[in-house]
Amino acid sequence: MDFPSIKIKDFEGPFDLLLHLIKKNQMDIYNVEISKITNQYLKYIDDMKFMDLEITSEFIVVAATLIEIKSKHLLPKIKKDEDEDEEDQEKNLIEKLILYKKIKRVAEFFKDRYVNSGELYTKKPEIIEEINLPNNNEDIFKNLTLLELYNMYNNLLEIYNNKQNKANVIQKRIYVDKYKIEDKLEYLLGLIENNEVSKFSEIIDKCECKLECIVSFLALLEMVKLKKVRVYQSDSFDNILIERRQDEGEE
């Protein structure tokens, strides 16, 4: 027996499914074709039943609402009040969809911030303290022309403005423990295990940034301190060569 091919995607709720269908059909959220969306929504519910997946009451409620709105579109309009009820019902559904879309976007924003928060530290903007100059400033202004004084004032003003953090946001991220000495130590030990002599320049070439270069160098110093390796140069400013010590750990 051949079973139909059905693709089921997990949705957080009925509005998540509706937004997916609207996006899939390239519709404007403010001008949704209820009839088309209803058919696809009900098809998804049928697929869930076929796959014996649990259907929550929220999906059923929205399905009933869509069917009611669609049926009112198809039936002849008799009274003005009924037209208004139909418009209100459809309007309420669209408003809930728009609200859900906004909430979902905000939730994704905070989720990204939460995930990234473990990788960095932040600090509050610095308060620039005024410099207390001595009471007697006569020596500072001796032999200064008016133009020099004017340029000095402009330079100080520019420095002060550049130090102001008007956005109240620290743009630079300081990553925490992305490169650890312990990890580099283990990496270097594995490297010299497989090679009789290793060039430090080749290790540096594989580093992603300046910070990783520094951590690699500190790890090398730690290895020398622990008497794990011997480092030497053939000449000044030549390659730093790393060699595993045969008398490892001995004085």
From Swiss-Prot:
Q: What is its main location?
A: cytoplasm
What biological process terms from GO does the record include?
Answer: cell division; chromosome segregation; DNA replication
Q: Name one Pfam family in it.
A: SMC_ScpA
- What's an example GO cellular component term for this entry? cytoplasm
Q: Which UniProt keywords apply?
A: Cell cycle, Cell division, Chromosome partition, Cytoplasm
User: Which cellular compartments is it found in?
Assistant: Cytoplasm
Transmembrane regions listed in the UniProt entry? none
Subunit structure, per the record?
Answer: Component of a cohesin-like complex composed of ScpA, ScpB and the Smc homodimer, in which ScpA and ScpB bind to the head domain of Smc. The presence of the three proteins is required for the association of the complex with DNA.
- Can you say what this protein is called? Segregation and condensation protein A
Originating organism: Clostridium botulinum (strain Eklund 17B / Type B)
